[in-house]
């Protein structure tokens, strides 16, 4: 790997230098060849294993943990920071740079009495979800590898430590700006320096002046809205949408007790630590705006309030616009830019269908996938038999056919639905089965699941079992933040 060190060299005071604590008996548990290509790597090697496990230094790496703060479940925490993640620097790849971070590499000054380790199960989950979201075309950080060890760590019970090698276009979060707004570490000078660095590194078409700041914040709002629209369309619940878990680039970031919907539930809670449902599936769009408001508050000494408000007022429209693009693709609806009056009609049609799904306790992903088998020219839908409330479905289907209109090339239409509606998602029970395999020394379930998730829209008939509804024990699994 070749590195540059722009964050480390230009933002002194925004991090603490800290070196990994090596792990005993390091061994590869998972490797993403696709992610490796982003930073010019091909195959895992013994040299890489020693470096990424913290047992040897990597040439050109700087090793640091960033400091930030954030709103956690609505309350402000004045100092957080990378408590178990150590960044090596920005690796140079064929098409740009990627931060390389070792998550679980040992304690840092921001560990808050933690051991700085990650347990194997959380490392495997982060690896799988990072790669799954990428192949579902959802903006996300990436996972290069998981490195196992025989280091014991204690959570509720004794577990084994592992390291996830994470790649991110940037690790800058909403919480970075909050920290340098509210702390006494040279603010507001450091706040402006961070903003200028972010723009120059990641928005090179914008200037570091009032006009550039205005355009930048509007872009952050738009990118965040698009990210969350993607989540809602695919049925993904993040679980911990604290502001320190929000990427400034609109990438899905910091995976904990996430889940994809099994049976559709608007109020689905995937996080055992969120009994009130602050971060429930249906609350995510509103929380996205709330988090952006906290970011705007942190930037209010630099960016004019009118510009911040104008950008925030764009959020709902951007969210709905992108959500409609995705959902029309799932349903096979077409529209032109001159038919904006169809937006309300289509939102009602989409909402009517998801409500039917919820009342009939249907699987979200599998129900959408059935549109690839639908004959849209037929008055009788093969979907009808999936519903207990068939009268309700008939009423909805009549509205749907009227909106759809005439479809001349049915096979092409069906193929397009299969390109919009995945067959395979990372269901929590599948991740759990892969983790059990790793615990038993069998990497085959993990490797097979990784392979399938790389092509989620393909039939892959030999893996049909991985697309079925979960067994009773695996339905709607709720995870904890323990990692």
Swiss-Prot record:
Taxonomic superkingdom: Bacteria
Coiled coil regions in record: none
One Pfam family in the UniProt entry: SelO
EC number(s) given by UniProt: 2.7.7.-, 2.7.7.108
Active-site residues from the entry: 244 (proton acceptor)
Catalytic activity as recorded in UniProt: L-seryl-[protein] + ATP = 3-O-(5'-adenylyl)-L-seryl-[protein] + diphosphate; L-threonyl-[protein] + ATP = 3-O-(5'-adenylyl)-L-threonyl-[protein] + diphosphate; L-tyrosyl-[protein] + ATP = O-(5'-adenylyl)-L-tyrosyl-[protein] + diphosphate; L-histidyl-[protein] + UTP = N(tele)-(5'-uridylyl)-L-histidyl-[protein] + diphosphate
Keyword Nucleotidyltransferase: yes
Cofactor(s) listed in the protein's UniProt record: Mg(2+); Mn(2+)
Binding site for ATP: 81, 83-84, 103, 115-116, 166, 173, 254
GO molecular function per UniProt: AMPylase activity; ATP binding; magnesium ion binding
Residues where Mg(2+) binds: 245, 254
Enzyme class, spelled out: transferase
UniProt keyword annotations, A-Z: ATP-binding, Magnesium, Manganese, Metal-binding, Nucleotide-binding, Nucleotidyltransferase, Transferase
Keyword flag Nucleotide-binding: yes
InterPro entries, sorted: SelO (IPR003846)
Stated family: Belongs to the SELO family.
NCBIfam families, A to Z: PRK00029.1
Function: Nucleotidyltransferase involved in the post-translational modification of proteins. It can catalyze the addition of adenosine monophosphate (AMP) or uridine monophosphate (UMP) to a protein, resulting in modifications known as AMPylation and UMPylation.
Entry-linked HAMAP family: YdiU_SelO (MF_00692)
The protein, known as: Protein nucleotidyltransferase YdiU
Source organism per UniProt: Shewanella halifaxensis (strain HAW-EB4)
Gene: ydiU
């Amino acid at each position: 790997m070749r590195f540059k060190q722009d964050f480390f060299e230009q933002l002194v005071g925004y991090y603490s230098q800290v070196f990994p604590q090596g792990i005993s008996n390091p061994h590869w548990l998972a490797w993403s060849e696709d992610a490796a290509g982003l930073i010019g790597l091909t195959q895992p090697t013994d040299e890489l294993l020693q470096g990424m496990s913290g047992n040897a230094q990597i040439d050109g790496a700087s090793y640091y943990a960033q400091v930030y703060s954030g709103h956690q479940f609505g309350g402000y925490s004045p100092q957080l920071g990378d408590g178990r993640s150590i960044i090596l620097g920005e690796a140079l790849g064929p098409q740009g740079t990627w931060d390389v971070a070792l998550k679980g590499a040992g304690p840092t000054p921001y560990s808050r009495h933690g051991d700085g380790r990650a347990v194997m199960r959380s490392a495997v989950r982060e690896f799988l979800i990072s790669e799954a979201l990428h192949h579902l075309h959802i903006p996300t950080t990436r996972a290069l590898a998981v490195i196992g060890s025989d280091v014991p760590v204690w959570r509720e019970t004794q577990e084994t430590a592992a390291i996830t090698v994470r790649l991110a276009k940037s690790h800058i979060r909403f919480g970075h700006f909050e920290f340098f707004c509210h702390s006494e570490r040279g603010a507001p000078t450091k706040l402006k320096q961070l903003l200028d660095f972010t723009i120059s590194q990641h928005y090179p078409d914008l200037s570091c002046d009032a006009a550039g700041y205005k355009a930048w914040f509007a872009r952050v709002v738009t990118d965040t809205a698009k990210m969350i629209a993607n989540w809602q369309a695919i049925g993904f619940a993040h679980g911990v949408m604290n502001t320190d878990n929000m990427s400034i680039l609109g990438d899905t970031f910091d995976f904990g007790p996430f889940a994809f919907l099994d049976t559709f539930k608007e109020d689905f809670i995937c996080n055992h630590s969120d009994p009130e449902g602050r971060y429930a599936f249906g609350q995510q769009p509103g929380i996205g705006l709330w988090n952006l408001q906290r970011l705007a508050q942190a930037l209010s000494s630099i960016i004019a309030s009118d510009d911040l408000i104008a950008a925030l007022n764009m959020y709902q429209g951007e969210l709905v616009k992108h959500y409609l693009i995705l959902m029309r693709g799932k349903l096979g609806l077409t529209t032109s830019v001159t038919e904006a009056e169809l937006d309300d009609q289509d939102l009602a049609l989409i909402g009517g269908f998801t409500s039917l799904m919820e009342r009939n306790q249907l699987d979200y992903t599998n129900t959408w996938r059935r549109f690839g088998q639908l004959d849209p020219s037929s008055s009788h839908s093969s979907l009808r038999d999936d519903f207990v409330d068939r009268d309700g479905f008939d009423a909805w289907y009549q509205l749907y056919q009227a909106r759809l209109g005439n479809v001349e090339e049915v096979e092409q239409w069906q193929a397009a639905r299969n390109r919009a509606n995945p067959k395979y998602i990372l269901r929590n029970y599948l991740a759990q089965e892969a983790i059990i395999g790793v615990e038993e020394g069998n990497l085959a379930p993990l490797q097979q699941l990784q392979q399938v998730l790389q092509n989620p829209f393909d039939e892959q008939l030999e893996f049909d079992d991985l697309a079925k509804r979960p067994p009773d024990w695996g339905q709607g699994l709720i995870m904890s933040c323990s990692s």
